[in-house]
């Protein structure tokens, strides 16, 4: 059995994960947002949605989501409006919410590029598949 080492791939993966997590959180904190708010903004960027659909997509209860949505609405990042072809009551990004979402997405893309920038497209796909497989193994 291999002895844990700071030079091992697993050690470096853990270290990179912790540092990437901090890097992703930085613009959230700077904008007064909480971890997880970015997931809501990213999901709403596709188009407006109902609270029930958003909660299901994020794997949250509607009650857990409600407080977050109230806070984001108070900060003028989302608005409650009719959405979809049936004009159901729902939520969508405001102009301010869209700007913040775009800034967060750009920051995310920069971190992704720092991770994958030296890899060719084929190697990027292979690396992503290997990480996905590893995550699935750990979830078992």
Question: Which role does the model predict for each range below?
Answer:
Residues 70-132:
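Charged, amphipathic alpha-helical coiled-coil/dimerization segments
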Residues 14, 42-46, 105, 132:
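Short, locally clustered residues in the helix-turn-helix/winged-helix DNA-binding domain
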Residues 1-3, 49, 122-140:
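C-terminal regulatory/oligomerization modules of transcriptional regulators
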Residues 55-75, 126, 136, 140:
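Long, contiguous secondary-structure blocks with strong helical propensity
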Residues 11, 22-64:
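N-terminal helix-turn-helix DNA-binding core of bacterial DNA-binding proteins
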Residues 6-7, 14, 23, 60, ...:
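Recognition helices and adjacent regulatory flanks at domain boundaries
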């Amino acid at each position: 059995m291999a002895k844990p080492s700071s030079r091992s791939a697993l050690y470096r993966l853990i270290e990179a994960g912790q540092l990437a997590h901090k890097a992703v959180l930085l613009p959230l904190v700077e904008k007064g947002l909480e971890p997880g708010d970015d997931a809501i903004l990213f999901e709403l960027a596709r188009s407006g949605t109902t609270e029930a659909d958003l909660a299901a997509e994020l794997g949250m209860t509607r009650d857990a989501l409600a407080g977050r949505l109230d806070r984001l609405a108070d900060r003028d990042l989302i608005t409650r409006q009719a959405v979809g072809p049936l004009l159901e009551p729902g939520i969508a990004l405001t102009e301010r919410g869209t700007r913040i979402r775009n800034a967060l997405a750009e920051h995310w893309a920069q971190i992704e590029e720092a991770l994958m920038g030296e890899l060719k497209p084929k190697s990027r796909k292979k690396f992503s598949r290997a990480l996905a497989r590893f995550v699935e193994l750990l979830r078992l």
